[in-house]
């Protein structure tokens, strides 16, 4: 359970964590769960997170993303990502595993490319909170990945955790700016 969460948030998110963010680990794999509080409506945050074809909107380290010409955002579709230089990766082919607009859940697997994240799977969920006429969002992102040969669990987790945390921080920055710029706090949505 991420330490960034309040007791109320933890209590409300318990079922979602059990359903979407808990993994059966094989020997040689590790997982982690991160939370990000965002001062923007969940509809706005979801409009950014759900765009499998535009991860660079909020994900650091992505130079470009391409999809097939007649791309339809549906489970099973793929994207090809080119990673910025300086990381232990060049390219990544990723498959959309889940996209549930009603429950605001999305997830993908890395299925190819030049990188060290073998069997990487990620799930992201977007949650609405309201208290004293304030609305905010908590985003949970978890992953499971095989540890590369020669790397410890701590090494693997440190690298993946850093990337996930930076992406969630950028998501908060982007969504909060969009909400502020809309004037009414509702934000516009990514199209």
Curated annotation (Swiss-Prot):
One of its GO terms (cellular component) is cytosol. Changing residue 78 to A: Reduced CARK1-mediated phosphorylation. The record marks 88, 152 as: Involved in interactions with PP2Cs. GO terms for molecular function: abscisic acid binding; identical protein binding; protein homodimerization activity; protein phosphatase inhibitor activity; signaling receptor activity; ubiquitin-like protein ligase binding. It holds the Pfam family Polyketide_cyc2. InterPro entries: Plant_def-hormone_signal, Polyketide_cyclase/dehydratase, START-like_dom_sf. Residues 23-176 are annotated as: START-like. It comes from the Eukaryota. It is found in: Cytoplasm; Cytoplasm, Cytosol; Nucleus; Cell membrane. The synthetic growth inhibitor pyrabactin inhibits ABA-binding and subsequent PP2Cs inhibitor properties. PANTHER family: ABSCISIC ACID RECEPTOR PYR1, OS08G0374000 PROTEIN-RELATED. Upon interaction with ABA, the 'latch' and 'gate' loops change in conformation leading to a tight dimerization and the creation a surface that enables the receptor to dock into and inhibit the PP2C active site. Receptor for abscisic acid (ABA) required for ABA-mediated responses such as stomatal closure and germination inhibition. Inhibits the activity of group-A protein phosphatases type 2C (PP2Cs) when activated by ABA. Can be activated by both (-)-ABA and (+)-ABA. Promotes drought tolerance. Homodimer. Binds ABA on one subunit only. Interacts with HAB1, AHG3, ABI1 and ABI2 when complexed to ABA, and possibly with other PP2Cs. Binds to CARs protein in an ABA-independent manner, both at the plasma membrane and in the nucleus. Interacts directly with CAR1 and CAR4. Interacts with CARK1 in the cytosol. Interacts with AIP1 in an abscisic acid-dependent manner. Interacts with FREE1 (via N-terminus). Interacts with the E3 ubiquitin-protein ligase RSL1 at the plasma membrane. This is Abscisic acid receptor PYR1. It comes from Arabidopsis thaliana. The gene is PYR1.
């Amino acid at each position: 359970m991420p330490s960034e969460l309040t007791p109320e948030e933890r209590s409300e998110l318990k079922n979602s964590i059990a359903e979407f963010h808990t993994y059966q680990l094989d020997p040689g794999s590790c997982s982690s769960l991160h939370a990000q509080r965002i001062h923007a409506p969940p509809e706005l945050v979801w409009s950014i997170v759900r765009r499998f074809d535009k991860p660079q909107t909020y994900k650091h380290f992505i130079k470009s993303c391409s999809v097939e010409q007649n791309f339809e955002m549906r489970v099973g579709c793929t994207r090809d990502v080119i990673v910025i230089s300086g990381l232990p990766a060049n390219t990544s082919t990723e498959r959309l595993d889940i996209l549930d607009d009603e429950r605001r859940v999305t997830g993908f697997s890395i299925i190819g490319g030049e990188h060290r994240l073998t069997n990487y799977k990620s799930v992201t969920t977007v949650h609405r909170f309201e208290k004293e006429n304030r609305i905010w969002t908590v985003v949970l992102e978890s992953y499971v990945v095989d540890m590369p040969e020669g790397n410890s669990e701590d090494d693997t987790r440190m690298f993946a955790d850093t990337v996930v945390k930076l992406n969630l921080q950028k998501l908060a920055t982007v969504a909060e700016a969009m909400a502020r710029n809309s004037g009414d706090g509702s934000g516009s949505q990514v199209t």
